[in-house]
């Protein structure tokens, strides 16, 4: 007599959010960038808990800055695309491991420096003034609920 397993199929969340991709015009330290951003906006970005991704060989941290705009009632998050710290947990002994000491949240967009998200379902990134001499124009990028970055943004919100 064999037991047949039955699975309850939950309603799938097929929603999508838009994030903004931020590319720096020139290399600049984070503290200078956010000092400049805070100077020209009414709301102020503060460093909050880093996003931590645990791997088999490395733990990667990504910096995160957050601000709340009282007029639009939106919470904005800047997340670094490239890991700022990688802590090695154990020695890699495989020749072709897919894990390295540097990780990108958006692997296909390694030229992106920051990912901008907000709490509103309809992202309006033009409300954030960015220093023109440091940052290129924000590019909107759709994220489906199946992507790892979507899950991370939802978890840390």
Predicted segments with their positions:
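Short, surface-exposed beta-edge/turn micro-motifs
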Residues: 17-21, 104, 110-115, 120
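Short, well-structured hydrophobic secondary-structure segments
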Residues: 29-74
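Glycine-rich, aromatic-bearing surface loops/beta-hairpins
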Residues: 111-157
């Amino acid at each position: 007599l064999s037991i047949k397993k039955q699975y309850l199929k939950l309603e799938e969340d097929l929603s999508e959010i838009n994030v903004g991709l931020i590319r720096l015009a020139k290399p600049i330290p984070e503290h200078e960038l956010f000092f400049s951003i805070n100077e020209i906006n009414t709301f102020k970005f503060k460093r909050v808990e880093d996003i931590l991704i645990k791997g088999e060989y490395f733990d990667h941290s990504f910096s995160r800055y957050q601000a709340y705009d009282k007029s639009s009632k939106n919470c904005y998050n800047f997340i670094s695309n490239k890991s700022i710290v990688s802590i090695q947990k154990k020695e890699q002994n495989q020749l072709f491991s897919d894990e390295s000491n540097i990780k990108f949240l958006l692997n296909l967009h390694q030229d992106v420096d920051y990912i901008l998200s907000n709490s509103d379902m309809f992202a309006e990134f033009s409300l954030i003034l960015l220093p023109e001499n440091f940052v290129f124009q924000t590019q909107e990028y759709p994220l489906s609920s199946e992507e790892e970055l979507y899950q991370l943004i939802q978890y840390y919100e």
